[in-house]
């Protein structure tokens, strides 16, 4: 408990190795076993088409979570990064947002857990779009009117992945607080609310992470360089960015062919004899 699956696997391998060396077992039970990583179908990774995104946002505007959904669509933040966003990570003068921590609710243990971003590359500073800036500025300007629960008096500690030192997350400094409870909204509650909005909008249901996928797809469609997108998403590998996060729509295929057609080759003539 408390260890990642990867760390648990390392400890298990060491345990079996030591048992074999001390003649407690005849052979390592996993000798000769090879694991293959399941191929994930592209269609299983959901994202929103432009039409579905528009329909979703029209309905979501009436939601108290609209700002959270819209900010992810504008920045590509992970859900935990959005929930753990604090005001000291926002620079209104430079119009940037810095990702340096996450926050999630552990349902099994019933507590909030602060932590570092997913990987070393996940530490990043994101330039804000005008829409993202306006969202954050409006929340900042109205922060004195929000409801606050006693939970916000807590300060959570976590280990900075870059330095190995202890850092703190001050709960009262969180950007997003549930309007009804005065506490941060739990990860799962966002998905539950999303499903209701999808049903109301008449589109297929999707989870919070699909908004991050949608951001990546819109970014490439707008002409953003893949390497730039990789940095903005906080990926260690460009392969992850392009293979897992960027989705090709029928409209983008058609647009790409039209752009190719417009670039020239006008000297190519149809040979009537060969047609």
Where are these regions (language model features)?
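C-terminal secondary-structure termini that scaffold catalytic or DNA-interacting sites
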Residues: 94, 105-107, 112-123, 130-132, ...
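Catalytic-site neighborhood detector that most strongly recognizes the C-terminal catalytic loop/helix
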Residues: 39-40, 47, 103, 214, ...
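Basic, Lys/Arg- and aromatic-enriched nucleic-acid-binding interface segment
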Residues: 21-85, 92-93, 104, 121-123, ...
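Short, basic (Lys/Arg/His-rich) helix/loop patches that form interaction surfaces
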Residues: 58-63, 75, 126, 142-231, ...
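Single conserved hydrophobic/aromatic residue that forms the stacking wall/gate
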Residues: 1-7, 11
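Small-residue (primarily alanine) positions within well-ordered alpha-helices
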Residues: 6-7, 19, 241
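C-terminal flanking helix
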Residues: 13-16, 20, 253
């Amino acid at each position: 408990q408390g260890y990642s699956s990867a760390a648990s696997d390392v400890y298990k391998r060491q345990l079996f190795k030591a048992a074999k060396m001390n003649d407690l077992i005849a052979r390592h039970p996993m000798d000769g076993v090879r694991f293959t990583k399941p191929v994930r179908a592209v269609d299983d990774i959901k994202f929103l088409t432009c039409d579905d995104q528009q329909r979703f946002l029209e309905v979501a505007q009436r939601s108290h979570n609209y700002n959270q959904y819209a900010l992810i669509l504008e920045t590509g933040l992970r859900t935990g990064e959005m929930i753990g966003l604090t005001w000291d990570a926002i620079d209104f003068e430079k119009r940037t947002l810095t990702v340096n921590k996450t926050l999630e609710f552990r349902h099994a243990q019933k507590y909030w857990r602060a932590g570092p971003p997913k990987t070393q590359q996940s530490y990043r500073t994101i330039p804000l779009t005008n829409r993202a800036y306006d969202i954050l500025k409006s929340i900042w300007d109205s922060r004195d009117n929000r409801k606050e629960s006693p939970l916000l008096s807590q300060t959570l500690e976590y280990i900075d992945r870059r330095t190995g030192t202890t850092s703190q997350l001050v709960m009262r400094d969180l950007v997003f607080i549930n309007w009804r409870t005065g506490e941060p909204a739990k990860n799962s509650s966002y998905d539950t609310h999303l499903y209701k909005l999808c049903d109301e909008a008449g589109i297929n249901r999707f989870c919070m992470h699909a908004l991050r996928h949608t951001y990546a797809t819109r970014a490439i469609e707008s002409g953003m360089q893949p390497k730039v997108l990789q940095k903005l998403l906080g990926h260690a590998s460009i392969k992850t960015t392009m293979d897992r996060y960027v989705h090709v729509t029928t409209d983008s295929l058609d647009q790409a062919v039209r752009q190719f057609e417009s670039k020239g080759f006008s000297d190519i003539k149809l040979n009537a004899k060969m047609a």
